């Protein structure tokens, strides 16, 4: 694009002035001096990484994971922490619910000796800790469990039954404004776990909403809706959950995709089972009757045995994983901003409907 000489001279002068005042890199052309690819961390589920479009959750962004009780929200975040730690990243867990089980976290592969953990007394304290960790530039992933447990100081110091209209929403709104810029500068991922509530008197549409006001919906680059869809049984014993995750909002790729996987009790996401299923679907793993084969070698009779073979042979599992990612992942392309995905907002009241 050719620019008029006088305009170009004026533009260069003002750019120089801005950089002198605010520092180099404070303003630049969009395609210049920056990485166009978003750095991501795996969620522990290959199908969810593919549904996200970029191979995982994005660094330097805010992520919200919400769903009903016991749907796998904390498990998913612990899988992300384990994946980040395997890459040598520093992680922190803000346990506002005071319910983190270190034994379970260790079973999922989390290095609990190097995981920073805080159990704050108030919501303001939790968010201040988040801000301090972010500004340090030394922490790569921060998880807050959960937004619903971030209780404002005024509510804690008041009496039960006192009205505190909009306190949590105002607190979250202020925190989002403060955190968003720092997260981008330090390339820190901030994951908020959230609970769902029912709106009273909704006749049509979805009565569900999340806690903490609307600010988080707008500032989050990715919003994941996680649900338990069924039970996994071994004879009569329930050993896990069938889980579905919907990408409700996605600023780094196309939204509204879904992923289905299994969460096994005491083990976490059944990643090897996913590799077997996706490998068969995309003809990387051959299936003849009950037998599964890879590159002509039999790897097991039945899905469970094939998965066990991949656990015992991580090099083969890694090979299939890399091949599937190369086949199914497309380069990340930013999409138009959307506040809440498939939800709508009443601009007068701020209600989600």
UniProtKB/Swiss-Prot annotation:
Keyword DNA repair: yes
Residues given in the record as ATP binding sites: 67-74
Record InterPro entries: AAA+_ATPase, DNA_recomb/repair_RecA, DNA_recomb/repair_RecA_CS, P-loop_NTPase, RecA-like_C, RecA-like_N, RecA_ATP-bd, RecA_C_sf
Keyword Protein biosynthesis in record: no
Biological-process GO terms, alphabetical: DNA recombination; DNA repair; SOS response
Keywords per UniProt: ATP-binding, Cytoplasm, DNA damage, DNA recombination, DNA repair, DNA-binding, Nucleotide-binding, SOS response
Gene Ontology cellular component list: cytosol
Function per UniProt: Can catalyze the hydrolysis of ATP in the presence of single-stranded DNA, the ATP-dependent uptake of single-stranded DNA by duplex DNA, and the ATP-dependent hybridization of homologous single-stranded DNAs. It interacts with LexA causing its activation and leading to its autocatalytic cleavage.
HAMAP family (alphabetical): RecA
Similarity annotation: Belongs to the RecA family.
Protein name: Protein RecA
Protein source organism: Shewanella sediminis (strain HAW-EB3)
């Amino acid at each position: 694009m050719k620019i008029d000489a006088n305009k170009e001279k004026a533009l260069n002068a003002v750019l120089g002035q801005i950089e002198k005042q605010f520092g180099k890199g404070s303003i630049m052309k969009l395609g210049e001096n920056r990485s166009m690819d978003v750095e991501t961390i795996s969620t522990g589920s290959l199908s969810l990484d593919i549904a996200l479009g970029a191979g995982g959750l994005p660094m330097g962004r805010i992520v919200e994971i919400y769903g009903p009780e016991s749907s796998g929200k904390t498990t998913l975040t612990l899988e992300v922490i384990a994946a980040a730690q395997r890459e040598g990243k520093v992680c922190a867990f803000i346990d506002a619910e005071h319910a983190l089980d270190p034994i379970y976290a260790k079973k999922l592969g989390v290095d609990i000796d190097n995981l920073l953990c805080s159990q704050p007394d108030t919501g303001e304290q939790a968010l201040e800790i988040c801000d301090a960790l972010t500004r340090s530039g030394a922490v790569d992933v921060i998880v807050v469990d959960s937004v619903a447990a971030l209780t404002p100081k005024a509510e804690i110091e008041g009496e039960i039954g006192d009205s505190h209209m909009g306190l949590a929403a105002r607190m979250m709104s202020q925190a989002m404004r403060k955190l968003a810029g720092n997260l981008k500068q330090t390339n820190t991922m901030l994951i908020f776990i959230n609970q769902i509530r029912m709106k009273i008197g909704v006749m049509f549409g979805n009565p569900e909403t999340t806690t903490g006001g609307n600010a988080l919906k707008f500032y989050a680059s990715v919003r994941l809706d996680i649900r338990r869809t069924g039970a996994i049984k071994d004879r009569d014993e329930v050993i896990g959950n069938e889980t579905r995750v919907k990408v409700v909002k996605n600023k780094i790729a196309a939204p509204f995709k879904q992923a289905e996987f299994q969460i096994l009790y005491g083990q976490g996401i059944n990643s090897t089972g996913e590799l077997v299923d996706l490998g068969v679907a995309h003809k990387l793993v051959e299936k003849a009757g009950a037998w599964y084969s890879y590159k002509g070698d039999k790897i097991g009779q039945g899905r469970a045995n094939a998965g066990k073979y991949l656990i015992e042979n991580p090099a083969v599992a890694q090979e299939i994983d890399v091949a599937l990612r190369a086949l199914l992942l497309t380069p990340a392309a930013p999409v138009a901003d959307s506040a809440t995905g498939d939800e709508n907002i009443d601009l007068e009241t701020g209600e989600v409907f």
